[in-house]
Amino acid sequence: MKLKKVLAATMISLLATTALVGCGSDKKNADTGKKVQIEYWHVAAESFGGATVKELVADFNKTHPNIEVVEKYNPDMYKGLTQNLQAAMASGKNPDVVQMGYSFLNYAAENFKYTDLNEAFKAAGDENFMKDNYLPNVLQLAQTEDGKQIGLPYSVSVPVLFYNPEIFEKACLDPQNPPKTWEEVSKAAKQIKDKTGNMGFFMQEYADNWTQQALIESNGGQMLTKVDGKVKAGFDTPESAAAYQVVADMVKNGSGLHATNEEGFQAYLSGKLGMVCTTIGKRANFEKGAKFKVMASPFPAFGNKPTKIPAGGNFLMVFSKDAEKQKAAIEFIKYLESPEALAKWSTGTGYLPPRKG
């Protein structure tokens, strides 16, 4: 299945249920000649949009001579970033703009002293920026349960099933008719292993358990539940167990790969793995690194049950304590969220853009 069709389908479904401004002139700093330096923390490794981050930062710095953005990559995705953020804030060395994963939203709201974006945009003279450029249900992606807007949606991701059409053909599978259900994925994985000797399937295993959440909830289970006002683990159910069993059975019969993320992704890129379930944000890296035509299909379903996909990706938070740094941070965020910059980010990663129009 062509990736353009997958992108179109996933964007429509995601933005329908949970839902792509020009750069400012920074006139005040231009008048004073003062240069403000801010830090931008992200999780984009070189294989996951890192080059695009550097390109965007360089472009912003070139067009905003009175602001200097210094980017910092944080390993181990959002778990590593959150740990580093805790340490930095404990020592009083706040970064200014941070990519925060949606799955860490409530934790960030409860444990970090962040800058109120509504107040920050108002102070920057653009209090209607969020309302004018984002659908209400998209803004909700970066809101707490009580409606606090703690950040601005930036990267919107969905899990998809990438596959190698050459391995499919060798296994007598039709690349134009990829698996649509988990039963079909299991059968295809076994067929790939039996006929080609290659591993059949791998599911990303990041610490936030995002794809596992999609797996569980698509089978009628829950990752979390609320009891007496407190959020607790909710995956101890028959539906959740049955969902996990699908992947466990593939590993048990030798057709499923249980490995680190980098090992799994490299197996796919090197032509030793038939299918990998991961974020659409890996698209650009896969297309660049693979020697075969990368193909993808939507996240598989459990029979006729509707798939339930939690929003993945990240939103932008501001932690600046200094007023001038806050203004510079907002200027940088407006640039990152501009149609031109979002187009570069989407092309360099595969993420879906959050803006209207």
What are these regions (language model features)?
Residues 118-134, 178, 195, 201, ...:
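Short, solvent-exposed loop/beta-turn-alpha elements that line the ligand-binding surface or hinge
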Residues 102-158, 186, 194-196, 214-215, ...:
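Hinge/lid segment of periplasmic solute-binding proteins
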Residues 59, 63-134, 170-172, 274-275, ...:
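Extracytoplasmic "Venus flytrap"/periplasmic binding protein-like
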Residues 144-154, 159, 169, 183-232, ...:
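Extracytoplasmic/periplasmic solute-binding protein
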Residues 33-46, 67-72, 97, 150:
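Short, well-ordered beta-strand elements
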Residues 186-191, 229-258:
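Glycine-centered hinge/linker elements that transmit conformational signals in sensory
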Residues 1-39, 62, 123:
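Short, low-complexity disordered leader/linker segments with a strong preference
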Residues 62-63, 68, 91, 169-171, ...:
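Extracytoplasmic/periplasmic substrate-recognition and gating elements
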